[in-house]
Amino acid sequence: MNNTRRKLGKLVTASAKKQPLNKAFLTDVMSAIEVLDRKGSRMPSKTYKPSSMVCMRQMYYQVTGEKPDESRTDYASIGMADTGTRRHVAIQEAIASMAELGYDWKYLDVEEYLREKWAQGKCLDVQVRGKRGVETSLYHKTLNISFMCDGIVRYIPSGENLLFEFKNQISFKYSHDDKDRGAVSKSHVDEAHEDQICTYCMALDLDRALVLYENRDNCNLECPEVFEVTPEMKQARVDKILECDSYVERQVPPPMHFDSKPCRWCQYKTACKKHGR
């Protein structure tokens, strides 16, 4: 595979030399973006990821260390992901300043929040692994869950703490409400995000969440609802992890997901095809 990449690199270089100088510059910039992205890639950790819990078979592959499919991400896709990451930072920095500006919202430091919970004998299974900007890397040692928490916000008048999650979407997804097909705008949290939100709330002892959606194309914002997370919803995610654990113990992949929605961006298509339904 390395030899193939070297050959491709030489072909790109040779092609660039035949182009006008401005086009050669453009080609090399795009190539450099892709090379740097590949250098930064690494094997996923053998943990459950709340953002990838729709398909249990994918959960199984992640936690057993199945090698993801080889893929080459083009510069445009890398740029779109980078834009989403930078918007994360900008939005979180604005929220972190709201209390100082006189608004009724306070952005909580997740580690300090957890220290208060630990003192109360709660969230004892959750460890802080570090920070990346304003996001906090967390690990649930009993359920083997790792995740990046966007934050927790406090509504100052009531003192209520709510999970905060930010999603950057293309126009189609941003304007689509999968719980109300006739809606002209998003009025519910996307079903695809419910596992993630419920798992975060379970781990952090929170009962409600605010999910802020941004339209990637024009930067419009929407917070469609206060998402209520019941004890039953939290337990359902725990049960899903425990069920997957049972497959891991037997070294038998779970059945395929009932529909192909999670398959589009799945990194384990080769292994999944090999194991069949």
Regions inferred by a protein language model and the residue ranges of each:
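Metal-dependent nuclease catalytic cores that hydrolyze phosphodiester bonds in DNA/RNA
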Residues: M1-L163, I170, S175-H176
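Metal-dependent nuclease catalytic regions and adjoining charged, substrate-binding loops involved
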Residues: G9, A16, H176, S187-A192, ...
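Short linear motifs at secondary-structure transitions and domain/linker junctions
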Residues: E34-L36, C123-R129, V184-V189, V238-C244
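Short glycine-enriched, charge-decorated loop/helix-capping segments at active-site entrances
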Residues: A76-S77, K179-S187
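Short, well-structured alpha-helical interface segments that form or flank functional binding sites
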Residues: R86, S146, A192-T199
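Residue-level detection of beta-strand scaffold positions
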Residues: L163-F164, C201
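A short beta-strand motif that forms part of the nucleic acid-binding face
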Residues: K167-I170, N215-R216
